[in-house]
Curated annotation (Swiss-Prot):
GO terms for molecular function: phosphoglycerate mutase activity. This is 2,3-bisphosphoglycerate-dependent phosphoglycerate mutase. NCBIfam families: pgm_1, PRK14115.1. The lineage of its organism: Bacteria, Pseudomonadati, Pseudomonadota, Betaproteobacteria, Burkholderiales. The active site is at residues 9, 87. It comes from Methylibium petroleiphilum (strain ATCC BAA-1232 / LMG 22953 / PM1).
Amino acid sequence: MTQLVLIRHGESTWNLENRFTGWTDVELTPTGVAQAQQAGRLLKQAGIDFDTVYTSVLKRAIWTAWHCLDGMDRTWLPVIKDWRLNERHYGGLQGLNKADMAKQFGDEQVLLWRRSYDVPPPPLEANDPRSERSDVRYAKLAANQVPLTECLKDTVARVLPLWYGTLAPAIAAGQRLVIVAHGNSIRALVKHLNNISDADIVGVNIPNGIPLVYDLDANLKPTSKYYLGGADAAAQAASVSALQADG
């Protein structure tokens, strides 16, 4: 049996401001830093250790990984950054306030954009200053790999090749991994690991900064999963996350 740990980044400034974030590179709040440090302490107290950390190329996840490792006294561990662990791209909603969008388009439409499996928000124009297509960190990617919008289905489609090509082989070889990423890239992994249907994944929320531990068998199938710090605390945090703009 081996373990895999998934952690959503700590609270970001745009989580706090209820703005859709997506691929926009925003900071952690002081609360987010504290959540990341507490995640590290919880892992250390549970006796869970790692060989390698995987994270996205967005600093709210990178800094969460660093603060978590600091809390574990494991700052020397390698941290591998991969764009495929980025948050779902929110297209034309990025940077906008969820409540304002609900007033403009209606609660039902905004909920469809946020929570449906296969309906993306309106795309950005390629020349929109919010587009990441000129961002140097994505310079080696083909233009069509840098999205202008995504639904969760699209996020799953980019996360699963990373799982099959890199993460799963590393785990099968005995590597102990922690993945520090985002609400929707983690939902993509959870959907795959637990074989959750397209309909049921809509109701799954991932709390900020609380380690989700999977026990995996030799075939990398889950035998159990649990949140450190208790299920009640995780459920309460997830309910708060569900009310915030995604990202």
